[in-house]
Regions:
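Short functional linear segments
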Residues: 1-54, 67-72, 79, 115
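ATP-dependent carboxylate-amine ligase catalytic core
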Residues: 29, 36-37, 42-47, 71-156, ...
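Acidic, Mg2+-coordinating active-site environments of NTP-dependent enzymes
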Residues: 47, 134-142, 158-279
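Residues that mark the start of a beta-strand
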Residues: 48-49, 73-75, 307, 332
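Hydrophobic positions on the alpha1 helix immediately C-terminal to the Walker A/P-loop
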Residues: 60-64
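Aromatic/hydrophobic pocket-lining residues that form π-stacking "cages" and hydrophobic walls in ligand
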Residues: 65, 127, 207-210
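Hydrophobic alpha-helical packing residues
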Residues: 65-70, 131, 213, 326
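Nucleotide phosphate-binding/pyrophosphate-handling subdomain across enzymes
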Residues: 138, 149-162, 167-171, 181, ...
Length: 343
């Protein structure tokens, strides 16, 4: 195990063993708002907050937007969950990820407030404290589970709230274990003072979203304003004015390409020009999202004519997306699969 991985595990262990911080899921905004109040409201210093909410596609949408905004010579801070390799990945600060030292320092500041928080709330405050110091142009914030009382639902006037695919993930956190309740928790508590973007949804989900947003005063942009199209073996983003080729060797499935298109729609509305977007698309990669691993110890254990594909799908929707991609491969496929008991 690498030294960096050990540092990450040690930090997670410190969080888990701290008596002030709870490992359990407990949705309540009072605790985190009290901490932020005691810290003089650092969340109010964050510019152009983009909340990314939903069940599947938050990471790929956030990552695509981050690439487009930074290609436009602007800086982003980004908060993701969960991390893949180490805790630092959760906290992007514009030029680099937070260091272990900066994370530890932030934990001590939070601990001094003597307020019981969940571990996810602590991680959210760590991001806010450090992003507030950076004054970056945009702050991209991925929601945790649901949104109504999620610790990222803190901003009255976000620049954008983007809703990716909503499905039956996180039913275990709800008293009413229905898709309707998931939709309500994710879109029923959005800001009335923002621009709401809705990603591709099943017709029933889209109908319910329409119903919930009837009384919302924000500008709402539905997914019928753009689409993913295929022509002569190539994929394109298309809206009424523009057509952009999706020139990528890293993004493979229809679901992920739709998330890329969703990001293109938002980027265009942020006045990022078409040429910048076209130049940036070939560079975008999504870790552990139908990703072909190119290096590492495992690659040395396969034959030269074999490929190693990694995907972290953990819902029915993302599993179907992976399965549909695998059906396009005209080669023998061998799989190693694991899943937690609660799925």
């Amino acid at each position: 195990m690498s030294h960096l991985m050990l540092q990450s595990i040690n930090l997670y262990n410190q969080l888990a063993k701290n008596k002030l911080f709870s490992k359990s899921v407990n949705f309540n905004l009072k605790r985190i708002k009290l901490v932020l109040q005691k810290l003089n409201h650092p969340e109010k210093k964050l510019k152009n907050v983009i909340n990314i909410i939903g069940s599947d596609g938050k990471y790929s949408l956030l990552t695509s937007l981050k690439y487009f905004i930074e290609a436009n010579n602007q800086k982003t801070s980004a908060y993701i969950s969960p991390s893949l390799k180490n805790i630092r990945e959760r906290f992007w600060m514009g030029n680099n990820f937070l260091s272990y030292q900066e994370i530890k320092k932030s934990m001590k500041v939070i601990e001094k407030q003597k307020i019981n928080l969940t571990i996810f709330e602590v991680l959210t405050v760590i991001f806010i404290l450090n992003a507030a110091k950076k004054n970056n142009d945009y702050n991209l914030i991925e929601a945790g589970a649901l949104f109504a009382k999620d610790s990222t639902n803190l901003f009255d006037f976000p620049k954008i709230q983007a809703i990716v695919n909503i499905n039956k993930q996180h039913l275990n956190f709800l008293k009413k274990k229905t898709l309707n309740e998931v939709i309500y928790q994710k879109v029923g508590f959005l800001s009335n003072f923002t621009n709401i973007y809705i990603g591709k949804q099943k017709p029933l989900v889209l109908k319910k979203i329409h119903q919930h947003l009837k009384r919302n005063h924000s500008v709402v942009k539905y997914p019928n304003t753009w689409k993913l199209i295929q022509s002569k073996g190539k994929f394109y983003y298309k809206d009424k004015k523009r057509k952009i080729i999706l020139n990528t060797k890293y993004i493979h499935s229809k679901g992920l390409l739709e998330n890329l298109c969703f990001a293109i729609k938002i980027a265009l509305d942020l006045k990022i020009n078409k040429k910048t977007i076209e130049k940036t698309i070939p560079n975008i990669k999504f870790e552990a999202r139908i990703e072909y691993i190119q290096k590492g110890k495992l690659i040395k254990k396969i034959y030269k004519n074999e490929k190693f594909l990694l995907d972290g799908c953990h819902s029915e929707v993302s599993a179907k997306n992976l399965a549909n991609y695998l059906k396009t491969l005209k080669v023998p496929i061998f799989g190693i699969w694991s899943m937690t008991k609660n799925k």
